[in-house]
UniProtKB/Swiss-Prot annotation:
Induction: Up-regulated in response to formaldehyde. Expression is probably regulated by TtmR. Keywords: Cytoplasm, Stress response. Disulfide bonds: none annotated. Homotetramer. InterPro entries: GlcG_carb_metab_protein, PduO/GlcC-like, PduO/GlcC-like_sf. Formaldehyde binds at residues 57, 114, 121. PANTHER family: PROTEIN GLCG (PTHR34309:SF1), SLR1406 PROTEIN (PTHR34309). The lineage of its organism: Bacteria, Pseudomonadati, Pseudomonadota, Alphaproteobacteria, Hyphomicrobiales. It comes from Methylorubrum extorquens (strain PA1). This is Formaldehyde-sensing protein EfgA.
């Protein structure tokens, strides 16, 4: 099942509240389980460059079913996914993209956030994703 527009809006509200708490301006993207943009919010003052980054973080998280920071760890020189960021018309392999997992353990979409440090981006994304679901997929053979 895909994330609904109501869920996407709730996730954006929670993410925006966390960004305000941290004193930063963010771009927040929600994609469905197919990686298609469902909702987007650009806070006043958020960088223009963060528009694309937020969307790519969300797509990366949904394409691989894991947090973008985890992909980043695997894509370092010598890593099993080295160079992966050049596939799929550009992926983002640093923190700020998180899968959204529904009550049945299925990925319904993902959130991507950009506009501050990767630590803040990740915290804001986690706040948004956690507002509507879980952030970890159950173990699958292809993820071990």
């Amino acid at each position: 099942m895909h994330v609904t527009i109501e869920q996407a809006e709730k996730a954006i509200q929670a993410a925006r509240a966390k960004a305000v708490e941290l004193g930063t301006q963010m771009c927040i993207a929600i994609v469905d389980s197919g990686g298609n943009l469902k909702a987007f919010h650009r806070m006043d003052g958020a960088w223009v460059g963060s528009i694309d980054i937020a969307q790519k973080k969300a797509k990366t998280a949904v394409f691989f079913g894991m947090k973008t920071g985890q992909i980043g760890a695997l894509s370092q020189p010598g890593g099993s996914l080295y160079g992966i960021e050049h596939s799929n018309q550009g992926l983002i392999t640093f923190p700020g993209g998180i899968p959204i997992v529904d009550a049945d353990g299925e990925m319904s979409g993902a959130i991507g956030v950009s506009g501050s440090s990767v630590e803040n981006d990740d915290a804001v994304a986690l706040a948004g994703a956690s507002a509507i679901g879980d952030t970890e997929l159950p173990d699958h053979p292809w993820r071990t």
